[in-house]
Amino acid sequence: MATDLNYIKYVVEQIDLPDISFKKMFGDYMVYYKAVPVLLVCDDCVFVKILKETSELLGEDCEQGFPYDGAKLHYVLDIDNSDLARQTVVAVYNCRKDKPNK
């Protein structure tokens, strides 16, 4: 099942930061902050990479899942908690902004 366009718009509204964009990829979406990929939205569920910074914010008890077959394990972000979602996006951006794209 692909992500609904209304859901990705809701995700962007919840994050409520300037320079947020999204791009459709294989029926699902990648969310970018200042052109840096920060979130993956698959099947109307928001996934964030497991990093030291995201572990500190979300905690070890955060729900985890696989966004698609063959993917690495990710945290499942509670997008209804807009403050936490915003902090998570900024944290991922700060640790990824200087890394070159593959």
Regions found by a protein language model. Give the residues of each.
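Charge-dense, helix-prone N-terminal extensions
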Residues: 1-102
